[in-house]
Amino acid sequence: MKTIGVVIGTTDEPVTEEYYSKHSNKLSHLEEYDIYSDYIPYDYAIYSEIKRVGEKNGFQVIPLFGDEFTLIDANKCDYIFSVFEGVYSFMVGGLKRYTQYMNILKKTKAKVYPSQKIQEFIIKKHQYMKYLDTKGYNITPTFFINLKKYNVKSIMKFIEKNKLNQIIVKPELGAFKTGFKKINNPTEKKIRDYLVKLKNDGYTNVLLQSFIEEFNKFGEIKTYWSGGKNLYAYRQQWLDGEGVFSQVEDKQLLRECKAIGKKLLDDISKDHEKLIQCRIDFACCMNNDKRCREFFINEIEICPTIGTEYYEAYGKAYTLLANNFIKEILS
């Protein structure tokens, strides 16, 4: 019997009571890992669904806990599916654990989904953003900063050239806005001081972009894909630091985003590898109150956080993801 290991261990995005009530028979086994009905993180729910579908197809399915699993643990598996991924490993153990995590996935004899190579490619945002630019996709003007060696004067030239009065700085390996900062009227001192802080916090690379005033007014359009097909899309805005979620009202814009998303997935499949799942986020800047002037790809996630609220299709992605993963390893 072949073994599938599912990398889990977050404490994020617990499933709703409604989801638990409907699927309690598939989730009750999680109590052996001290995960109870009052708080089941999304990745444990995904693990449960992969376990259900995998066992139906003759696989043994085991958890691999992202903050502690070793190469020995990984090598007990024939296949590994990452839900808890590199950014989480950095969050729990800094650069040391992130490096260990990536080395385990690189060295294991198991076949890893998504591969270590593509995980690293997406985590290192400067790599995939350069890829998007090369392929002709719209991205916002971005300055990439290596915290081991950078020139503040070059950064200021980029700011002056693009006439930026407000900028945002976001580190690679940052998640849930960790390390994200908006800087008004940027100066060499403000930038240098913040980059020093990020380096001291363990980050290695940073993206600097324009702060787009209209960004939050119309929000991001987040599109979730599995098996090359779009399952759902929703709009996210921010109010007092909290996410506000709603349906996308501009259907034409949504169709355009989906068309670009499908093309991007085809390109990634051709140039890198076929993805079991992916979330592609689009953002707009506006020139009026009715229609987006120009939209761009703001972010790609290949191990996205998936909830069970209405705007994320009530957790249907868990079943779709599990079926597509098992289908892929059986093919």
Question: Where do the language-model regions lie?
Answer:
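Extreme N-terminal starter segment of soluble prokaryotic enzymes
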Residues: 1-7
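Structural motif
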Residues: 5, 79-83, 168, 207
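Conserved N-proximal alpha/beta basic substrate-recognition cap immediately N-terminal to
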Residues: 12-13, 37-150
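A solvent-exposed, charged loop/short amphipathic helix patch at secondary-structure junctions
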Residues: 15-41
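A short glycine-rich, hydrophobically flanked beta-strand micro-motif that places a catalytic Asp/Glu
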Residues: 63-66, 208-210, 272-288
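ATP-grasp fold ATP-binding core
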Residues: 132-133, 159-178, 203-216, 234, ...
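Phosphate-binding site of ATP-dependent enzymes
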Residues: 178, 182-271, 286, 295-296
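C-terminal active-site "lid" helix and adjoining low-complexity regulatory extension at the edge
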Residues: 272-275, 284-331
